[in-house]
Amino acid sequence: MPPHGPNSQGGRRGGGHSSGRRGGRGGGGRGGGGGGRGEQRWWDPVWRAERLRQQQAEMEVLDENEWWNKIEQWKTGGEQEMLIKRNFSRGDQQTLSDMALQMGLYFHAYNKGKALVVSKVPLPDYRADLDERHGSTQKEIKMSTETERKLGSLLKTTQESGSSGASASAFNDQQDRTSTLGLKRPDSASKLPDSLEKEKFSFALKERQEKLKATESVKALKAFREKLPAFKMKEEFLNSVSQNQVLVVSGETGCGKTTQLPQFILEEEISSLRGADCNIICTQPRRISAISVASRISAERGESIGESVGYQIRLESKRSDQTRLLFCTTGVLLRRLIEDPNLTNVSHLLVDEIHERGMNEDFLLIILRDLLPRRPDLRLILMSATINADMFSTYFGNSPTMHIPGFTFPVAELFLEDVLEKSRYNIKSSDSGNYQGSSRGRRRESESKKDDLTTLFEDIDINSHYKSYSSATRNSLEAWSGAQIDVDLVEATIEHICRLEGGGAILVFLTGWDEISKLLEKINMNNFLGDSSKFLVLPLHGSMPTVNQREIFDRPPPNKRKIVLATNIAESSITIDDVVYVVDCGKAKETSYDALNKVACLLPSWISKASAHQRRGRAGRVQAGVCYRLYPKVIYDAFPQYQLPEIIRTPLQELCLHIKSLQVGSIGSFLAKALQPPDALAVENAIELLKTIGALNDVEELTPLGRHLCTLPVDPNIGKMLLIGAIFQCVNPALTIAAALAYRSPFVLPLNRKEEADEAKRYFAGDSCSDHIALLKAYEGYRDAKRGGNEKDFCWQNFLSPVTLRMMEDMRNQFLDLLSDIGFVDKSKPNAYNQYSYDMEMISAVLCAGLYPNVVQCKRRGKRTAFYTKELGKVDIHPGSVNARVNLFSLPYLVYSEKVKTTSVYIRDSTNISDYALLMFGGNLIPSKTGEGIEMLGGYLHFSASKNILELIQRLRGEVDKLLNKKIEDPSLDITVEGKGVVSAVVELLRSQKH
């Protein structure tokens, strides 16, 4: 038998000492350790020593040869895993782990080492089925005699309403997909009756274009256009487009590819009298890009936006029957493909920013590769800001490529060590009170927060590596932490530039809105930078209202410097012409998805070299610039060349729903055709979730509910909440909460008034134990204040963002329009859909319907509550939640919007719910094996009750499901008539369990 000493790889596979500890935390919870044997006295050294001796005596001894042979024999069989329930020491568990590793297997210890698993496939950190204490829960359902009598009476009077309604095919026949999606096809020329009319239209377009070219404003802008590198390649580009169905164009930032290439095609088609048949679509990954590029091209053509050039984004559109070139977000085009899979009448399609590898863009590329053989006349141009065109060219059958050189002035580059030396800024260690920094020794203790690049820097001998730098700089490098961005350092760098460097705008790259708002607050409080007569400070975030975003393109008055605080949206999606200085923090907020443990991880992560190159290039647009990189060069040198594509690092349920709506076969086979296919387990998880919420049936086909969810541009769970809210006459709360979850929370947390802000949020939540109710009440308060004209004061006093609330208002209106389009609400009768909009029990039940299977068990532990999920075992409430300070909950469960792994696994935006809400609106109720109860979530939740109560619950749930199915298959069904008895019974049941 080969040797198998301790091996660090065993730990990575889930084995060894770390595995045993992980299994212990996940399986048995924290604390205790006495095996449940009487009083625990671990604080008593005598008792502790005796208990440890007892545990040691109870340990079995591992016979290595015996277990090697057992595992080898099992490996040749057909079973996927071997479960070992033996009391081995941690050292023996490590030995088993090493054996498994050498055999190419996986190992994990669960339930404090009492359940050891050797597996042929990777193992998750937690297994509910192996957790004796928290793996499942048995809950007895009780009901008062009065409630039992009322429910029985209401059910008795409920008239049976026949079969479950129209078939799926009938559903398809009933729906007008164009009206459902609320999209207008950008092919208005197809309305023209005959070729003569088209010819007249083409002549008119050409005549107008020639007249505009002769105007002084267009001539002046043409002189600017001709200086762009893209202009020099105009003829080569147009020839390539005419001769090839697919062309891949890479171009450095500032070369003009985004504004000029679509315009070249438009000008050529109109000049060649093909304007009537010309229908160009150019996709952009972000709303602001679609608007800004369309505006720029309109100006260069001497037109107003919405004439020959327009845009369409969610909630906003500027276009007309004259529009021949339409800029839209990738999501808008994907929804167009649902109603028009062949992109009828589209002549040219340009997909910009493909280098970003967003999920929508990768999804679109799969569709387009399948579409091209059916549309040989369609011309596809893929545009990338980085020189990685070969990968895209290969994907599209070795299509030709073209590179446009950049047009930038020289940009000096300063890394952290140079910035510190030049600015003489001192980074303080944590001992000095600056929470952003920390000594290298103390940082090494916080292993959980480390990444590989930070570890790489910590292993460097600072005094040796940076011996040419001053001692002050070396001390600062010792204190610097890569774990989080030092906002004080960013502020100091901006101040250094403004005091000592020449004029020009400053562009600062941060990871998200929290850092932008913190830095904005610091700048406003800074005695020098806070002077608004000298400095114009503008935040730039992808989710900001478009009106606010447009300000960043305007040049400030003389003697006033513009400072833009941005996320990675400013890397390549937009161009701010007057930037001379870039301050790069080196990170971007990026979601990764742990498919094995079914949890999203949201942490700022280091960017790629390609992104760093893009950021640097923003500084050389108008003159020689400087890029201040606030991280060491050794970290930059270790950056990956490109970021991971989004499709392989995020949950896929919304994408999978879109795939089914396109009717392109199975989800797995479709995604296997991606440029870089996602992990098969991530795909399985998404399909499983869609089946759990009822969007897909057992054979992976869309259900009637799934078809409706496809029409709502939100996560499937949020879409389901909207539909259930409309059906159960609770539509206003559903609209508000859905808008907040789909966009962002309106609550802001100022750094120096965090406690007051938390208190304001708790005030809105009241005694509901619900973040969702807090969102709802905050919006309702804003709406009331707006009616009185004092919404600004209301937002200021309650720490709310008026910008976010206005966007929520717009999204509510959009969701209401969509619900109206598919027949779920009649906007002329709002009261009919809001009978229960102020009933907290019904609102909680609607939340349960939408958020299931995101369920947490609340288990009392003395004077506090511990929280457990099926996938991960013990979790924590996010500190920003109103429930973070609640010690004891009166109801046994929480439903939550998302769980995210940062420093710990947190659940965000949670609501305390009752047994009855879960039983009526959760997943399928499965009779237990004994026949004395019912189960949910694959047996994770068990409910027992008397025979009469069980039968009553199952009867009512059956009526609820029947009513939901009828309404979903026939949205015109009047619930107030057809389902009055069922709804009344549900309300009665929910109200009976008030806390």
Swiss-Prot record:
Binding residues annotated for ATP, in chain numbering: 251-258
Domain (Helicase C-terminal) ranges: 484-663
Record keywords: ATP-binding, Helicase, Hydrolase, Nucleotide-binding, RNA-binding
Catalytic activity line of the entry: ATP + H2O = ADP + phosphate + H(+)
Gene Ontology MF, one: ATP hydrolysis activity
Keyword RNA-binding among record annotations: yes
Database matches in CDD domains: DEXHc_RHA-like, SF2_C_RHA
Motif (DEIH box): 352-355
Biased composition (Polar residues): 171-181
Enzyme Commission designation: 3.6.4.13
Composition skew (Low complexity), residue ranges: 161-170
Positions of the Helicase ATP-binding domain: 238-405
Region Disordered, residue ranges: 1-42, 156-192, 429-450
Biased composition regions of type Gly residues, renumbered to the chain: 25-37
Family designation: Belongs to the DExH box helicase family.
Name listed for the protein in its UniProt record: DExH-box ATP-dependent RNA helicase DExH1
